Regions:
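Long, C-terminal-biased catalytic regions of enzyme "large/alpha" subunits
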Residues: 1-321
């Protein structure tokens, strides 16, 4: 009887029933709303719950749960998907920590397609993409480029070694070190001392005479801002389309609100019998009160499971932005 009551309530959610129609619930789920759901999807969902109740009444149930949404964030990377299921992208540009050490730069591949769908021209799209992910070269970058580096002592071989590391770099500073360029080159061609090269926080670009502002400009040109906020041509009303689970890049301020994650889970919950495995990302400055209110909102939304993660709360995390 208890299981049949659960199934009847699931069926009511698929029909978007009124709260008073549910049995034995103090909180009621968010039903499937036909005006926001593809017709074939809600018809299939209703048919599935009709059938579940019909067969369960006749034969009983073997399993308490038969459908769930599995964790898909990391799997999606292996599948070459930007996102899977209801999980939003972590960031437009993110760095995945590798088990053997180091990081791998991952760029959302849907940005150009989305911009095309929104009606932007090819040249505008290229400008926006370059602003976000960079050009992966310093050849003609402002201030720090092949011409200015040659004047500092760089030759073709050194420029090639430096360029080879730019595609996966957090920032251009990571490619200017003795490991990437070679100790002998740094001493003989750049005039740097062993004491400088062995200093743990040595800033080679500063030692070569480049200012912080010049480094920042070259860095944005090469590695991008990692956000579309402030991009040329992009209309303000289109910014929410590119919102991610976290703030994107150094200058990004936008991110998907915590309750928006929960509302998305609540909208998907009526389609499945079990729980949804999904991380609800919170910014690093999230408070205990915000964590508390998020759990309460998830409970009121009849979400069967919820996991919160505050950015930077672990010593090591698989993705960073």
């Amino acid at each position: 009887d208890a299981m049949l009551r659960v199934i009847r309530n699931h069926r009511r959610a698929s029909y978007n029933a009124a709260p008073e129609e549910y049995e034995g619930l103090t909180m009621t789920p968010i039903g499937i709303q036909p005006e926001h759901c593809p017709p074939e999807l809600f018809v299939a969902a209703r048919r599935a719950w009709d059938r579940a109740l019909e067969l369960g009444t006749a034969y009983g149930y073997r399993n308490a749960q038969v459908t769930v949404i599995a964790p898909t964030g990391t799997i999606g990377l292996v599948m070459d998907c930007d996102t899977t299921g209801i999980e939003p992208d972590f960031a437009l540009v993110k760095f995945k920590k590798l088990a053997g050490g180091g990081y791998f730069k991952i760029i959302n591949q849907s940005i150009p397609t989305a911009l095309t769908t929104l009606g932007y021209h090819e040249s505008q799209i290229q400008d926006i993409v370059n602003y976000c992910v960079g050009r992966h070269t310093l050849q003609t970058a402002p201030f720090i480029n092949h011409e200015t580096l040659r004047r500092k002592g760089f030759d073709d071989a050194a420029l090639a070694r430096m360029e080879g590391g730019l595609a996966q770099a957090f920032e251009i500073q990571f490619t200017f070190n003795k490991y990437a360029l070679g100790e002998s080159f740094c001493r003989e061609k750049l005039g740097l001392t062993d004491a400088q090269l062995n200093e743990s926080n040595f800033n080679m670009l500063k030692a070569l005479g480049f200012t912080q502002e010049e480094v920042a400009a070259a860095n944005d040109y090469c590695c991008g801002t990692m956000t579309v906020e402030g991009a040329p041509h992009l209309k303000a009303e289109h910014l929410p389309i590119f919102d991610c689970a976290n703030r994107c890049g150094r200058i990004g301020q936008r991110y998907i609100a915590v309750n928006a994650h929960i509302r998305m889970m609540a909208a998907a919950q009526p389609f499945i019998s079990g729980a949804i495995s999904k991380t609800i990302n919170m910014p690093a400055d999230a408070t205990l009160e915000e964590v508390k209110s998020s759990y309460l909102f998830a409970w009121k939304s009849m979400v069967k499971a919820v996991a919160l993660y505050r950015d930077g709360s672990k010593l090591s995390q698989p993705l960073s932005a």
